Amino acid sequence: MGCGLISYRYGKVEDTFFEAFKGIYTRLLITADDEDVLKQAIYDSTATPGAVIGRIEGGVEGFVDEDKTPDNRLGAIAQYWFNSYDLEKFELELSYRIRQDVLVKPFTSVFNMTNNPKGSIDMMRHVGHCGDGYEWEEKVDNRNMIVVPTAVPDFKIEHEIAYSEGIMGANFWYMCSEKKAVVEAGRIIIEAINDIEGVIAPFGICSAASKVETNYPWIGPTTNHPYCPSLKKRLVNESKVPDGVKYIPEIVINGVNKEVVNKAVKIAIDSVVDRDDIVKISAGNFNGELGNYNFSLLDILNEY
């Protein structure tokens, strides 16, 4: 599966693969007068990773200085993803995030930042008309903006928001022997991923890897029980938790193309693979039967 020549450094990386999926996304720039308000808007609007339950999910790509934004204010770039090509549902879900998490924050604006678009969404229908017919349009840095009048004047959003196609659900597990490694190594990983333009980690440090098979189908994906350390003795031979492993956090990555996803996986694993408290690195998959793509961990680590 992996490369024939495996670097000694990657001896603790399992020769396995992760599955990833096609998805549509939009890449937005949110600006605000105040840094705390900006952070609240960007983090609130990306807080719930809902793709596995048929909702939208997002993540923060990075922050932008005032001199690099269209309105010369503090900015942050976020991605919002949907795992279906139901554009009407995507538009509605996106509007909820914008209306309930951004529009309601004082002095915020939203600009399109999607490169290589496949199409666009008219934001008047589900966001602009929050102005109840009193909304209007104006230019900001040669961009067509909808102005929604609010009690703290005013919210602005670019009229056309582009969307494109990318890769979602790339993942790996870093199996830890010590509790502190879960967060310590996880922070290092997330910081490394943030250095790669075009990718997000929608769950941050994820403590609950899931599986498709379930005893309760109305819930959706449930806990991946063979990889729960607390069930190792109870499951006996069914358990897949390696000896010495007490915690199995997961990192999920969405990216605008294969190149940036692979770079993010590589730099993330490289950032922690030498830690003594990380026993093994592996990945989640569905035997190659569910995702649109299969990516070998060792191929990525040896080729990028």
Name each region found by the language model.
Residues 2-69, 80, 87, 92-250, ...:
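Conserved mixed alpha/beta catalytic, RNA-binding, or beta-rich assembly cores of soluble enzyme
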